[in-house]
Amino acid sequence: MKRMLSALLLAGLFLWSASQALAFKPAVLFDMGGKFDKSFNEGIWNGLEKFRKETGIKYREFEVTQEAQREQFLRKLASRGSDPVIAVGFGQAAALTKVAKEFPKTRFSIIDMVVDLPNVQSIIFKEHEGSFLVGVLAAMKSDSAAVGFVGGMDIPLIHKFACGYVQGVKHINPGVVVYQKMTGTTPAAWNDPARGAQLAKTMYDSGADIVYAAAGGTGLGVLQAAADNNKLSIGVDSNQNHLQPGFVLSSMLKRVDVAAYEVFKSGQDGSWKAGFKILGLAEEGVGWSLDEHNSKLVTSAMKRKVEQVRKDIIAGNIKVHDYMSNNKCPVQ
């Protein structure tokens, strides 16, 4: 009898778990560049794949290839009962604002922008803090006293990366020149590796020996240009050190993988909450990468200095200005 009861309980637990999995229908709308952009979108995908492998729960997905699809795909996911729905990137904000109002019972999360609605969770990062750290690395590594920055689309968010980077560089050596260029003013700026390579080469030819790219797929061109010209680059969002081993000084890590994973996990266990989440150094939401692909480029002194700066920023001893607080950077 006890064995029968145990078997029934196990069967009931299995059926309950199965029904819960069936009822839980997470989804994601990737931004332009797609889930294999080796940068921002791919970081999101890595986090969601971790969730899928751990739980066995599949998720629906769409990729934006043109502006009109944002609203269309978000609405399609919500109308099919997907919940929670992740909108990837700041470009989804306008469409999400509209669609989230149409589906007030659906939980939405947007990564990299704020949408202030009762059924939306907004996750943003202190990119300026992580960029400060790689700026410190660049200044310590540079032999030419000149470094560069290539941004993607010319928007305040990317100036936030640039400003943090310049502050980090100047913190070590105020005399270092920082060349800065944005790729363009339309979403196409995120996926133009040839232009990224061209901008980086111009900086290398002008004397820069390290260029930081915060430009999505365009940044791959910067990394390639560094390798082609025997210079160094700095990657962004995901760990890009392996893409050009020995030529990527480091990558400014933006832990969108962790953020995406937590959206699905909290959605499943009931702890998901609307509102705002801001992830910086203290929350381990940003950082820098050190692995077998760049370990020979980073000296012990550099590691010690960056670690001390990281602690000082968290403690409030070093203040890193957020460009988006006033659309200005105190240093150039």
List the model feature ranges, each with a label.
Residues 1-4:
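Positively charged n-region of N-terminal signal peptides that target proteins for export
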Residues 7-17:
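Bacterial N-terminal signal peptides
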Residues 22-332:
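A residue-level marker of the well-folded mature domains of exported/periplasmic proteins
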